[in-house]
């Protein structure tokens, strides 16, 4: 039977009415199958998450010892400006993550006043060395304690240093090997003090940290002794910083007993 162009199929009949918002709530999954529709979003999300993680790990400033994550020790280093030197083997560091590339010293200022620095620096104990003890708590100063302090000030105060951190000590200081750039060379601060006879190799029975440099430190100490440099050339009976501390600790215990 011939079908007229304007005729309709017998199956064509009234269509069931659709709810007005059916098409609004329907998810077009075909849209998400197209890479061009979801790849940019995935890349943007991944980039943002990576940037946040990078900032938290490498660019977030650490204002004090208590803010250092335990996982950082023996894995990370701290870069910053030395703001004060309190003794022959310790100082305070203002953490400047990223250095000049992150804007420090030209876009972001580093405080210099003591009041502005309060609670914002990290105390650092130089690993592997022991400098002569200065006078404090009513105790006499050791020979060459003033020279050791003066050398450390002239060598690192106001300079940027990198500290490879190992642990936190009983005084809430960070123990680490400290490096400073002098002209075009990077110098191990502790090693330079030993070479000049201004510090001994750290000889405590527990808590000694060397970062794999103990042999190098002891060789440098032997040379300084042989040349009678610094404290090794002093007259009279030699008392190491460790022996000095042990003597005063024994005296304090005897007074309490």
Curated annotation (Swiss-Prot):
| Major location category of this protein | mitochondrion
Where composition is biased (Basic and acidic residues), the residues are: 236-246
The enzyme's E.C. designation: 3.1.-.-
An annotated GO cellular component: mitochondrion
The residues the record assigns to binding Ca(2+) are 130
Topology versus the membrane: Single-pass membrane protein
Please name the catalytic residues of this protein.
Answer: 125, 133, 173
This chain's protein is named Probable endonuclease LCL3
Provide the species name: Pyricularia oryzae (strain 70-15 / ATCC MYA-4617 / FGSC 8958)
């Amino acid at each position: 039977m011939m079908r007229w162009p304007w005729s309709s199929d017998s199956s064509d009949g009234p269509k069931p009415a659709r709810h007005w918002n059916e098409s609004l709530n329907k998810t077009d999954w075909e849209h998400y199958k197209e890479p061009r529709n979801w790849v940019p979003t995935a890349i943007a999300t991944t980039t943002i998450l990576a940037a946040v993680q990078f900032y938290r790990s490498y660019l977030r400033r650490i204002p004090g010892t208590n803010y250092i994550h335990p996982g950082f020790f023996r894995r990370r280093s701290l870069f910053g400006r030395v703001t004060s030197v309190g003794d022959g083997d310790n100082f305070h560091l203002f953490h400047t993550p990223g250095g000049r590339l992150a804007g420090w010293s030209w876009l972001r200022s580093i405080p210099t006043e003591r009041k502005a620095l309060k609670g914002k620096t990290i105390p650092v104990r130089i690993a592997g060395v022991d400098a002569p003890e200065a006078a404090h708590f009513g105790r006499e100063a050791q020979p060459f304690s003033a020279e050791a302090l003066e050398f450390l000030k002239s060598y690192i105060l106001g300079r940027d240093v990198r500290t490879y951190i190992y642990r936190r000590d009983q005084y809430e200081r960070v123990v680490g090997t400290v490096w400073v750039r002098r002209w075009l060379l990077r110098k191990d601060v502790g090693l330079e003090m030993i070479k000049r006879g201004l510090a001994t190799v750290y000889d405590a029975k527990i808590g000694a940290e060397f970062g794999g440099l103990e042999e190098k430190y002891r060789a440098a100490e032997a040379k300084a002794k042989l040349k009678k440099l610094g404290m090794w050339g002093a007259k009279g009976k030699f008392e190491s910083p460790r022996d000095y501390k042990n003597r005063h600790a024994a005296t304090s215990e005897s007074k309490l007993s």
